[in-house]
Regions:
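Structural and coupling elements of P-loop NTPases
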Residues: 1-310
């Protein structure tokens, strides 16, 4: 079995309101990474993560499930947490182990209570977050309404990709940072004219955010100079690490649309264990902070135990 260096690991919790597609997203991530060879469905009881008899019967997640996806030489450990408030402890456990979280919400045009709870828990636990707006091509979906509803309450949220829609279906996306558009196969296409205003608006917000992370970048921003790709990446990493930026992307987990691009963002932007926030621990009776250090003595954190009745 391949051993991954710390900077090639992402521990990611999938959290959010119940029924928004977290388990379907986990399934799609594993399928795209070829961890599994069949895209299972929650509705027919064939999903990998919902394996308990009660979960299959009720078509909901009841307990925290673990999976992984090896993508671009990076191991993404997936912690799929249930969304029902009755099982909130499972989500808290996932956030204790995760270095980042994907908050999954449907494109209903509004913000759900579960989305608010998930984002607030990430802030409380100091876990870097990314939002995945799911089911954008479902009937009567409203991606932009959903994005703006979340942005109105959480100023740190800015879309970094926008879905291209045709006939109510997602056919591609626009990268807000580069103003380049791509179809679902990754081929570059023209940015639709009716999306240009939104792209420019969000690009401006992102550039301003990046400028705020460094004095030299701020001066460059005020002088009207463009940032280099390296400066953009550095600024985004700093903003995410400082919990002042929550990227927002879109897709459809059930059909795997936008899932590879989501995994690209997890690899490129979200923290590996050494870059994540340190956790509090008791050492020799005193409270201290512990970070990840491959050269340090072994240290483990237990987040879940299971009693096997057999």
């Amino acid at each position: 079995m391949k051993i991954f260096d710390t900077d090639s690991i992402r521990n990611v919790a999938l959290i959010g309101h119940s029924g928004e597609g977290k388990t379907s997203l986990a399934e799609a991530m594993m399928f795209e990474a070829k961890t599994i060879d069949r895209l299972g469905k929650v509705d027919d009881g064939s999903s990998t993560m919902d394996y308990d008899d009660e979960e299959i019967k009720r078509k909901i997640s009841i307990s925290l499930s673990l999976g992984y996806a090896i993508y671009r030489n990076t191991k993404i450990n997936i912690l799929d947490a249930p969304g029902f408030f009755d099982f909130e402890g499972e989500m808290v456990a996932a956030l204790h182990a995760a270095d980042s979280a994907v908050v999954v919400t449907s494109a209903t045009g509004s913000i759900t209570v579960g989305t608010e709870k998930a984002l607030e828990l990430c802030q409380e636990k100091k876990v870097s977050a990314l939002i995945f707006v799911n089911a954008v091509d479902k009937d009567n979906s409203d991606f932009m309404g959903t994005a703006r509803a979340i942005m109105a309450k959480y100023k740190s949220v800015i879309p970094i990709e926008l879905p291209i829609m045709e006939g109510g279906k997602m056919v591609g996306c626009v990268d807000v940072l580069t103003d380049k558009a791509y179809d679902l196969q990754g081929k570059e296409i023209a940015t639709p004219q009716n999306m240009q205003a939104d792209v420019e608006e969000f690009n401006g917000k992102l550039m301003e955010l990046i400028a705020e992370t460094d004095e030299e970048l701020m001066m460059k921003f005020f002088d009207g100079e463009k940032f280099t790709d390296e400066e953009i990446q550095k600024g985004l990493h700093a903003a995410i690490a400082d919990d002042i930026f929550v990227p927002l992307v879109a897709g459809n987990a059930q059909t795997s649309k936008g899932v590879k691009r989501l995994m690209d963002k997890l690899v490129d932007l979200m923290p590996h264990p050494q870059r994540a926030h340190k956790i509090k621990a008791i050492v020799d009776g005193k409270e201290t902070e512990v970070g990840v250090d491959p050269s340090a003595p072994f240290c483990a954190q237990v987040i879940k135990s299971v009693v096997d009745p057999y």
